[in-house]
Amino acid sequence: MDAVELPAFSEAVLSPANGALAAMTGFGNSFATEAVRGALPVARNSPQQAPLGLYAEQLSGSAFTAPRQSNKRIWFYRIRPSVLHGRNFREIECGLIRTAPCRDESSLPIGQLRWQPTPLPDAPTDFLDGLRTMATCGDVFTQVGFASHVYVANRSMDRRYFCTADGEFLLVPQQGRIEVFTECGRLVAAPGEIVIVPKGMKFKIDLPDGQAGGPVRGYVAENYGHYLTLPERGPIGANCLANARDFLTPTAAYEDHEAACELIMKSQGRLYHTTLPHSPLDVVAWHGNFAPCKYDLRRFSPVGSVMFDHPDPSIYTVLTAASDTPGTANLDFVIFPERWLVMENSFRPPWYHMNVMSEFMGLIYGVYDAKPGGFVPGGMSLHNALLPHGPDADAFAKASTKTLAPERLSGTLAFMFETRYPLCPTGYASELDTLDTMYPDCWEKLERKFKV
């Protein structure tokens, strides 16, 4: 029986020939793209001979038999297969990178914690050199929890590449632009944007603005558990919050460098190094739904109270990673964006709270309304489960007495990594000079006002 002839149709999005950045829209879509016309096979994943002499290779992000709605995989068509990347690994020091379980490094007593911004480096420092862990939770061996990192850098990753088998990376730039060059292509992100890099995908981070742009700084959540996805909207309906159309996935881009380079692999909390004779970012075409993406947080459409009371912060959830308990996240990524406050006869800042979840917060820019002093851009706070927190004394006094009129919170963007698991500060975080030991004093002036 003769082979069935297939129509010569390709669904691939062709990258710009001039190397300009381009992206495809949607969240969790099955994308198809090629950097060279004809590089993506038509109607087959693994033809007997892949086009242009490329190798076909699959990266699985889930078990083969995972339900269709959660099944993740991507097909690469690359110059050399990844089996050439995995030889001669040797373990190297982890530096300031830590992985859960990591419970015994800190001797800090329980309490509300806050740090001033991580200092920017003077010595040459790339993203991997400047990555350091502030807190961890869960257990990478059972694939639950996450690590909260910060990064600082003043140079690009020159002939240096990174891959983590422990979790997906959620990158949150706070100062300066970064270019994330993955096996799928290139994404540039500035403060106010985020990037997700899938687990097991090789990438490097460059500074597209060079020395003129100055050093960069930001936050990272390394998610060990179920992958981040868009939260259910429930009674909100079909619109608002983060809309899938606003997520951008890169079109194919590749490096064809025949020069020695370094690949660092993170696995089971350890770092391993190997030397390659060529760049591992040599994917000329790809298709699938396990791909990196970026999102502009300013496109988040917030909802809120239009009459009275401050709603729960969960209404500002951008992304969520489920745990085994419905509605109780392994990791939520929540933002506090620009918005209107119109509630009548109500205390408008976030209220005083003891949360069964643990909260790691950062400020990307502007002023956070519950902490107008002391919590500055680049800073961080950690409120573990059931530790009380809330507006400082000055914020309480102002919000309790001001004349209420419609008010726009402008020029502000804070975020929160929230988890069901207790967050353990690392030894590095516990010993930093930037640890604000006076933080609990911000509530000291809250006076007794009870009268009968």
Predicted regions located by residue number:
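Jelly-roll (double-stranded beta-helix
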Residues: 1-452
